[in-house]
């Protein structure tokens, strides 16, 4: 009797990526005029000078936001610092977050090339709204997914969660035969928009960086030949909390919306720990230290100083974080979706420039998510050869 040949399970792979943004584009050079006009702070020249400097240092050229001047005029409590406005903010986000997620999902599904009925799992991640049933439930309806799709909803994880969802999708795909996981991260930062005040200057930093966006990633193991074209293999994941950094990024749900605090120590915390968490991440792969310059990177750009610290402490050559800096410049900090935008930019640029792999011609790479805790979540990726 001939031996039975079994298909060995493979690591989960990213099979498609889709992204979406609201239609409203805000150029950074014009944003200070907009912000101080709509919040009725044009007389605050001292604060305006400070905000101008923050915008100049942000290295962000433009962002996409759902919020418009007309919405603010209709809802003045949103731009009045401390005024109760949680209800109207949540009413906006509970509708718009699933819709933006739907737009990104349809792009990913189109690239994937498989019937939508083959999606078995859905992970939805947002920090913008907290209704029950949640955005996962709403997206099931918007996309017409099977009501028996296994859903997981992640609320209020923050900016590191773009890597978290890859870890979860990997587990689902590798432990459920034939699973195809739709991962969606979507943020509408209307909940974080505030009027200006002398007592809470962190708001100025958020106003210069935060933006709206959604990403959708389809993950599965054992891709179907000639139908599914993998982009990246998810090899290993690791999460850690940086010591004594709890105050670094904090957000609280209050009647005034989501009140947040951003410590100037965050770049220092990341820079002081990046070699350690990178070393421990790659120990899970082969137990060896990597030449960091041999990797491709998708680093959550919580701000330019964080990106600079990662580059400096790892001794990266100029241009190693090109994709990260490009997304920060063209989209701002969109929270969890941002690292997926970076991977999308990277694979597109790799194809455009005739590279051999989706990871800028390199084999190994890493996604670094950074957020409240301070929590760092890393995902080791292996690129795929470009054959199209």
UniProtKB/Swiss-Prot annotation:
Catalysed reactions, as listed in the record: 2-hydroxybenzoyl-CoA + malonyl-CoA = 4-hydroxycoumarin + CO2 + 2 CoA
Primary role: Type III polyketide synthase involved preferentially in the biosynthesis of 4-hydroxycoumarin from salicoyl-CoA. Can also use benzoyl-CoA and malonyl-CoA to produce 3,5-dihydroxybiphenyl as a major product and benzoyldiacetic acid lactone as a minor side product. Can also use m-hydroxybenzoyl-CoA as substrate, producing m-hydroxybenzoyl diacetic acid lactone as a derailment product. No activity with p-hydroxybenzoyl-CoA, CoA-linked cinnamic acids or acetyl-CoA.
Protein name, UniProt field: 4-hydroxycoumarin synthase 2
Description of pH dependence: Optimum pH is 6.5-7.0.
GO MF terms, alphabetically ordered: biphenyl synthase activity
Keyword entries, A-Z: Acyltransferase, Transferase
Gene Ontology terms describing biological process: 2-hydroxybenzoyl-CoA catabolic process; 4-hydroxycoumarin biosynthetic process; coumarin biosynthetic process; polyketide biosynthetic process
Highest taxon in the source lineage: Eukaryota
Signal sequence region: none
Enzyme class, first EC level, given as a word: transferase
EC number(s) recorded for this UniProt protein: 2.3.1.208
Family affiliation: Belongs to the thiolase-like superfamily. Chalcone/stilbene synthases family.
Temperature dependence comment: Optimum temperature is 35 degrees Celsius.
Organism: Sorbus aucuparia
Gene name in the database record: BIS3
Active site: 159
Quaternary structure (record): Homodimer.
């Amino acid at each position: 009797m001939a031996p039975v040949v079994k298909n060995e399970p493979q690591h989960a792979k990213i099979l498609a990526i889709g992204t979406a943004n609201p239609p409203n584009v805000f150029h950074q050079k014009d944003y200070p005029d907009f912000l101080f006009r709509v919040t009725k702070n044009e007389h605050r020249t001292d604060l305006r000078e400070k905000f101008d400097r923050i915008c100049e240092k942000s290295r962000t050229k433009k962002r996409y936001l759902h919020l418009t001047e007309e919405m603010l005029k209709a809802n003045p409590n949103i731009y009045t610092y401390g005024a109760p406005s949680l209800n109207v903010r949540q009413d906006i986000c509970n509708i718009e977050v699933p819709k933006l997620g739907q737009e990104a999902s349809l792009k990913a599904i189109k690239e994937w090339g498989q019937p939508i009925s083959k999606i078995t799992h859905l992970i939805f991640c947002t920090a913008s709204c907290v209704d029950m049933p949640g955005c996962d439930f709403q997206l099931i309806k918007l996309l017409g997914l099977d009501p028996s799709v296994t859903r997981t909803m992640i609320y209020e994880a923050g900016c590191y969660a773009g890597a978290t969802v890859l870890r979860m999708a990997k587990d689902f795909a590798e432990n459920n035969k034939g699973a195809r996981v739709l991962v969606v991260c979507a943020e509408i930062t209307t909940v974080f928009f505030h009027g200006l005040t002398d007592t809470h200057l962190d708001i100025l930093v958020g106003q210069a960086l935060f933006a709206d966006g959604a990403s959708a990633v389809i993950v599965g193991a054992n891709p179907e030949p000639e139908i599914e074209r993998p982009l990246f293999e998810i090899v290993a994941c690791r999460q850690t909390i940086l010591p004594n950094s709890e105050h670094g990024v904090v957000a609280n749900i209050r009647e005034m919306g989501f009140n947040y605090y951003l410590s100037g120590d965050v770049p220092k915390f990341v820079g002081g720990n990046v070699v350690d968490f990178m070393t421990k991440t790659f120990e899970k792969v082969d137990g060896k230290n990597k030449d960091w310059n041999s990797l491709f990177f998708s680093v959550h750009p919580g701000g330019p100083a964080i990106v600079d610290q990662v580059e400096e402490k790892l001794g990266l050559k100029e241009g190693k974080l090109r994709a990260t800096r490009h997304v920060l410049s063209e989209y701002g900090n969109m929270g969890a979706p941002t690292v997926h935008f970076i991977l999308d930019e990277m694979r597109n640029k790799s194809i455009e420039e005739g590279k051999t792999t989706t990871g800028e011609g390199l084999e190994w790479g890493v996604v670094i998510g950074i957020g409240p805790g301070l929590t760092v979540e890393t995902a080791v990726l292996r690129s795929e050869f470009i054959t199209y």
